[in-house]
């Protein structure tokens, strides 16, 4: 009889423990059901890149003076600059400029150190292709400006990270009157309207 009662007691404890585990799992599920979705429906919705986002490099052929500073500051010596010396003008003339974005680490040193500002960083990050040789952009391909996310008619720009808790985007331990570096995404969208 004692053995029977101990088995009933063990069964009851296991049942209560199982119910507790199921309750904990359901509590987590219901907690997540109250939140907004975290995922972005990518081809149709895109986040607005931040001000400091480093995407594909834009090149302006007319501004380039063939100084090759971009090649010297690049950690992997990536930009290819072909030029010839014009004896009449007594200066270098650019013939061809290219960057292989399959190798580029998007550090933007070339943009930062360019003396004529012929290089700039765009917000384009969709560089996927089927053949990696197509990632070798010449001066014509780099001269094209991409669509901005906010101007693309086929895309709904996501204005902010709505799922983050309040105060996450503010500066850490800064006094109230201190200015925050950069702009919040919702402020960028307000300026575009």
Swiss-Prot record:
Chain positions recorded as [4Fe-4S] cluster 1 binding sites: 64, 67, 70, 114
GO biological process, one term: photosynthesis, light reaction
Cofactor comment: Binds 2 [4Fe-4S] clusters per subunit.
Keyword RNA-binding: no
Residues in coiled coil: none
Binding of [4Fe-4S] cluster 2, residues: 74, 104, 107, 110
EC number per UniProt: 7.1.1.-
Localization, UniProt: Cellular thylakoid membrane
Listed name of the protein: NAD(P)H-quinone oxidoreductase subunit I
Species this protein is from: Cyanothece sp. (strain PCC 7425 / ATCC 29141)
Phylogenetic classification of the source organism: Bacteria, Bacillati, Cyanobacteriota, Cyanophyceae, Gomontiellales
Gene: ndhI
């Amino acid at each position: 009889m004692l053995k029977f009662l101990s088995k009933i007691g063990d069964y009851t404890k296991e049942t209560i423990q199982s119910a507790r585990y199921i309750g904990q799992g359901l509590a987590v599920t219901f907690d997540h059901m109250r939140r907004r979705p975290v995922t972005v429906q990518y081809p149709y919705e895109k986040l607005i890149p931040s001000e400091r986002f480093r995407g594909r490099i834009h090149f302006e052929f007319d501004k380039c003076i063939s100084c090759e500073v971009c090649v010297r500051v690049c950690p992997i010596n990536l930009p290819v600059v072909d030029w010839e010396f014009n004896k009449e003008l007594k200066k270098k003339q650019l013939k061809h400029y290219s960057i292989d974005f399959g190798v580029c680490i998007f550090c933007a040193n070339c943009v930062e150190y360019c003396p004529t500002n012929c290089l700039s960083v765009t917000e384009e990050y969709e560089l996927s292709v089927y053949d990696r040789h197509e990632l070798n952009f010449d001066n014509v391909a780099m001269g094209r400006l991409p669509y901005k996310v906010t101007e693309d008619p086929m895309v709904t720009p996501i204005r902010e990270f709505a799922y983050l808790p309040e105060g996450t985007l503010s500066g850490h331990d800064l006094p109230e009157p201190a200015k925050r570096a950069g702009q919040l995404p919702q402020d960028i969208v307000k300026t575009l309207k």
